[in-house]
Amino acid sequence: MAWALLLGWPLSTLAATAECSQGLLQRLGWRFETAAITTPQVQGGPVCTRASLAEAQAAGDLRVRWPGTLAAADRQALLQQLLDDPATVCAYAFELGAAVQRATQALQDNESFRFTGVQLGWIGFGARGAPAQGWQRVRSFGRGYVPAASNSRALDAFYTGHVRAECGVGRQVAQLATQRELYGDAAFDAEFAPAELSIGTFLGLHDTDSILLGAQAGQFMADGKAVRTSAMGRQAFVGLPAFIEHVFDKGTLDDLSNQAENFVVVEVGEGAAQALAEHGGLAWYDQRNRALWQLAQGIPRVGQRYFERLLYERDPALRAQLAPRYRDVVQQMDQLLDDPFYQQFVIYAHPRGIRPVGYHIIRLLDRNPRTPFSIDLALHNLHTTLYRRWREAQLRHCAATGRPGSLTLDPN
């Protein structure tokens, strides 16, 4: 049917569509070469394993050679295939990664976006209330809100306003802020209806039009232990929602506010990516987390943030005070934590900001010492529905402006 539709389009429409499609692909890093060949040759390459787009191109990824005699309909069909190609989704991940970094840095920089303190509801907008900061309440006890005016103004509440929320809302906001940074404010305001940007309890989002978990989320990817994602490479992790959760039952929890940590992945270093691929995902690190927890059981905690100071900050004075019988244990813990995954798998978790995942595993030894913790990726649609929506928005932008290769994020 797709072929029939293509063949039925006027030539001028095909040409315009092809120009916009090729322009977007080139903006994402594809290079096209006309050659004396009879059929197109496509080299996508393992783009998600690369540190940067420049590295991918230098390795020969994202290259197309096609005949100059290729018919317009065939050309458009090939371009459409490339838009759906896994290598293109990985190239898009570089744009996504830059957006994640801008979004999470902005959220981290707002000292008035907090977790602790007395809240009147699940999300607290302070004395001025939600409407003054661009949000409208749709559920009682602060459990659900949608943007009241422009989407970008609503997110400004978390960039520069005074808001209190727990880490689950922090993750939702980071995910939505990433879309804002990916589109640019004008397109972000135009693309999404207010209900699509609902925030609140995770359970409540399922009954909304949320693009994260509701009716507009579309096609989810489920890879809890990151088996497939680890095989794809480091860029496949960027922007993904995930969580750290207690392994034993709630009866072992001493600090309920730290029973879990919700986060988005900001960056994955080369060593961390190699380790995840070698070990087949996160299950291996659940075992390492338990080993760390077991070793910690034999060391008495002294003062606040004891393990954080001992193992993350590696405070020399604190280490000097260790009784000789504990030094070998601490050395074993150091060796486990020196794994690149703990050092280079960088996440954003509200209100802790941008830190390596090892920091969080260590701090939870202090907060909830009677249970180990596990790490899982959450359901997500970054590489499916949200990628396709962004792609179509860029193609519409090209058609409206007549500027192939331009993005909605670009200055006018």
Where on the chain are the PLM-derived regions?
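Active-site nucleophilic cysteine motif
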Residues: 156-178
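Low-complexity, Gly/Ser/Thr/Pro-rich intrinsically disordered linker/tail segments
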Residues: 282, 287-412
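Cationic-aromatic interfacial patches
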Residues: 21-83
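Bacterial N-terminal signal peptides
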Residues: 1-12
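Boundary at the C-terminal end of the N-terminal hydrophobic targeting segment
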Residues: 13-18
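Active-site nucleophile-His-acid catalytic modules used for acyl/amide transfer and hydrolysis
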Residues: 123, 127-130, 135-161
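...with weaker cross-activation on analogous glycine-rich loops/strands in unrelated enzymes
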Residues: 198-273
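Low-complexity, highly charged intrinsically disordered N-terminal segments
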Residues: 179-184
